[in-house]
Amino acid sequence: MKTMTILGSTGSIGTQALEVAAKHNIKVKALAANSDVEKLAAQAKELMPERVCIYREDKKSELEKLLSGTGIKISTGMEGLKEIARMDGVDIMLNSVVGMVGLVPTLTAIEKGTDIALANKETLVAGGELVIKAAAEKGVKIYPVDSEHSAIFQCLQGNEGNKLKGIILTASGGPFFGKTKSDLGGVTVEQALNHPNWSMGRKITIDSATLMNKGLEFIEAMWLFKLRPEQIEIVVHRQSVVHSAVEYEDNSVIAQLGVPDMKIPIQYALLYPERVECDVKKLSLTDYGKLTFEKPDYDTFDCLRACIKAVTIGGNLPAAVNGANEEAVAAFLDGRVDFLDIGRIVMSVCDSTPRKEIKCVEDVLEADRKARERAKELIGA
């Protein structure tokens, strides 16, 4: 029986992964969540894992009451996540937490020799060089869970000996595609959370609205597939049917298509290389009638431009724009800044951060901390 652990089990990706695990007889050995004690406790009672972690330490006593008498070990904070990442007898760890908190547990699991199903973008955005190097040294496989990176990964299967020319990274365009900055001045949180195609958590939905999500995926793709910035083309594809494509040396393009449902990439990552029945709607191209492809608007969406600039410069810049974005999005969701301020803050931090080499995880964390401090100054200004 295959075994797994899940960081972020109460979120959108985590809950769908548990459905996949239940259907395909995968043993779940540990669960972790940020703050949703009741949902985590319900999952734990159903699955009886060896260990659970609630990241918020102030929630521990409530979780202990809910799991009293079960014998399940309970931990908190970063140490709790690392304990799960170090567990013996685990085939794969799904990292679907949100934010920079995902980096250290990923590196810990790699050091243990555990394969990773990666849905936490920040792991590769901020610490890509460290993560890819560590995985190569330990012989650890990283299976992408993002639909776009999963699509690219799938298109590469069986073509390992052929030269990759580049990739086409598709984007839905979010809820504000076709709008200009003058149109977006009064955007509300509710409007930004209304994604046309995907059901996701709040932070990633805002990132999709600002196109920051696509910028983060651009950076991820560079590390996952060993690409240069000029080898990646972003294309807005409103229907979210073509999840991404790869282009080979002979100019042939191979794409992966499917209905917009995260269960497919989750299942592919967890069961690779097997393809088995999946509880998703069958794709009917005739139901769509036509598929459209357009260029993104780099002038309106500052976050996308900031990400590409950051990764082109390299070093600590990707970690900086990521940290600034996390602070800006949190401020927007709390009503402290306007929608357009997110892009302004991210670009300002990108422009004002001097480049430094990343040599260890402490360098990544320092870049993140300094960027957050600067972002908070801009938020409070």
Please state what every model-predicted region is.
Residues M1-A381:
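Catalytic, metal-anchored helix/loop core of enzyme active sites in primary metabolism
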